[in-house]
Each structure stands twice: as C-alpha cells, then as structure tokens.
C-alpha cells in the first residue's frame, strides 16, 4: 500500500513540475480566455483541408479534384498568413481579424453550398483560396504573452511553450474530428468549423486588456507617422545590437 502511495506521490510531483508552470500562467487574469479562444478559433487549420478532401470526393467522386483544391487552399494559406501577420502588427489584432473572419465565413458558406449542389469545378477553384482568410491566432496569442510577461524571460519561455502545446493539441484533435464529421456530412463539418471560428474569435477578440498596441497606435502616441516610428525603433535596435557586440 505504501508503495502505491509513493508511486502516486511521485506521479503527482512530476505532473506538478511539468504542468504546474502552465497552470500558473492560465490562472493569471485574462490569460485562459485568450489562450483557449485562440486554439478554438484555429480549428480551420487542421479541419478545412480534410473536410474539402472528403466532401469533394463524396459529391464529385474525384480524389484528384479534392487534392487540387486542398493544395490550392494550402498554398493560399502559406501566402496569406505572413501578409495577415504583417497587417496585424501595423493596424492591430481586432482591426485585421474581424474583416478576415467575415471573408472566411462567407467563403465557407459559398464553398459548402457549391459542393453540396455539385457546382461547376471552376466555381470551387475560385472560392477555395478565400478559405485561407484565417487570422494568425497562434502568433497573436504569443504576442499577447510576450507583451504581458515582458522582462520575465523564464515565464515568457514557458508561455511560448504552452502555446506550442495548445497548437499540437489542435492538430491532434482537429484532423480525426474533421474526418469523422465530413464522413457524416460535409455541411456538418464546415458548420462545426464555422462555430469554432465564431466562438474562439469572440473569446479572443473581446479580451481587450491583453491586446498589444499596433504600430499605428504606438506611432500616434509618440506623435510620429508609422514610417517615422518604424525608423526610430530600427535605429534603437541597431544601437542595442552594437552595444551587445562591442
């Protein structure tokens, strides 16, 4: 009996060492809301490609078409993600995310309707790239952690690690979930993904206290144009780098 108690105590101690730091971060005010919200809103990343593949094969009986559409969405995502990230830095998280989400929702509804009604293939080609209109939730979440924990290197590293854990969980859950729902109904899979986007976005974007300021806001507060502000910050970074290297 004592051996079992010792094993249980050891497991508890290891779990505390591994997850205790994460729990501490999530107990901080406002952090659980935006962290969990970002994961929920990220569900299109693992789910859309699988949903397109299974739905197109079901309605069109063509794996080649499904593969091409999935590739188009992936390429569009690779192009749009850094561009959206840059816009977020310039104009702010809410200012960029809200119109981006609206584009995604309209595109998802249009593509789902087109697939279920067996629309001409060219319609699918035109609509699919717009499903890459996904805000960079992971990057925005990490930006919030970095801003909140500025100066605390240890907890910042732990927070970024936690963000990585959440990302992995999203992919582990999202792919099989998308497969299951899409086999039942492509409409169900897209609808579920859309609900995740709306719920996650509301959780994340309505948490205003942790949102970092955009370059536009910082420049306005400094009485500078955005270009002047960027040049000033670049000069500061150069001076800091010179001091560190000297």
Give residue ranges: language-model regions.
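Helix-loop boundary and gating motifs at the non-cytosolic
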Residues: 12-78, 239-246
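Cytoplasmic helix-loop-helix junction between adjacent transmembrane helices
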Residues: 129-169
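Hydrophobic core of transmembrane alpha-helices in multi-pass small-molecule transporters
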Residues: 39, 120-137
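C-terminal ends and interior cores of transmembrane alpha-helices
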Residues: 102-118
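Cytoplasmic membrane-interface "Motif A"-like loop-to-helix N-cap segments
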Residues: 90-102
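Transmembrane alpha-helix termini and helix-breaking/packing motifs in multi-pass membrane transporters
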Residues: 173-193
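Symmetry-related core transmembrane helices of the 12-TM Major Facilitator Superfamily/SLC fold
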Residues: 189-206
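Helix-to-loop junctions at the C-terminal end of transmembrane segments
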Residues: 80-93, 182
């Amino acid at each position: 009996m004592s051996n079992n108690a010792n094993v249980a105590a050891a497991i508890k101690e290891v779990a505390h060492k591994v997850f205790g730091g994460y729990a501490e971060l999530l107990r901080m005010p406002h952090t659980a809301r935006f962290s969990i919200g970002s994961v929920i809103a990220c569900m299109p990343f693992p789910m859309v490609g699988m949903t397109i593949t299974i739905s197109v094969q079901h309605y069109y009986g063509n794996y080649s078409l499904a593969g091409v559409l999935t590739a188009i969405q992936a390429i569009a995502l690779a192009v749009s993600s850094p561009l959206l990230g840059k816009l977020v830095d310039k104009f702010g998280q809410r200012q960029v995310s809200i119109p981006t989400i609206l584009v995604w929702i309209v595109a998802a509804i249009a593509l789902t309707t087109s697939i279920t009604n067996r629309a001409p293939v060219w319609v699918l080609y035109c609509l699919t790239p717009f499903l890459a209109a996904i805000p960079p939730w992971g990057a925005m979440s990490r930006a919030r952690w970095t801003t909140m924990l500025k100066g605390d290197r240890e907890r910042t590293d732990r927070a970024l690690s936690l963000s990585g854990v959440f990302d992995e969980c999203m992919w582990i859950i999202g792919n099989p979930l998308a497969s299951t729902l899409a086999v039942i109904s492509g409409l169900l899979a897209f609808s579920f993904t859309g609900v995740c986007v709306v719920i996650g976005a509301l959780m994340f974007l309505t948490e205003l206290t942790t949102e970092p300021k955009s370059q536009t806001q910082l420049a306005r507060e400094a009485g500078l144009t955005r270009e002047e502000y960027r040049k000033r910050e670049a000069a500061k970074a150069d001076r800091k780098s010179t001091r560190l290297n000297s």
